Amino acid sequence: MSKKWITTKGGDKGETSLCDGTRVPKDSLRVELYGTLDECQAHIGMARAACSYPEVCEELCRLEQALGPVMGYIARCETLPVPDISVLEELIEKVRTITGETFRFVRPGDSLPGAALHVARTVARRAERVAVKLFRNNELDDSSYAYVNRLSDTIYALALWIDHLTREGKGTPCE
């Protein structure tokens, strides 16, 4: 018997398995939520690949690594820890302290990694819109909902940090 690697063929009829073995339609809100977070994580990775600021890269990597278990938890991998919002809030505060930035509307594009993070932020906002539907139906716990809700704020802060470094002459700003 051959071992399956990428292709399991289990989804060929439009369903997938959650971590607990439950079969659900591939277009269920839960699958849409962790799929949207997966997309967000890929954009964060793109930003990290384009980033030349070691401290920011380290935080981007930590965020990427944190998202894996969050997606697993949402996919009902009950052995994984409940998402911890304090990690995101600490990172937001760290960036605020470093940059002195407050909320403002921005024009993405001052740097490639900053622009990639703004794409990740908009994907995180889409995840929020999916999460709220699950939350209102009592299908998503408070901690997971709060984590998804705070994720776009965290990514926004990271984009501001990168663009702040760019404006300080440590990169090339958009004219």
Regions found by a protein language model. Give the residues of each.
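Phosphate/pyrophosphate-binding loop motifs in nucleotide- or prenyl diphosphate-using proteins
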Residues: 1-175
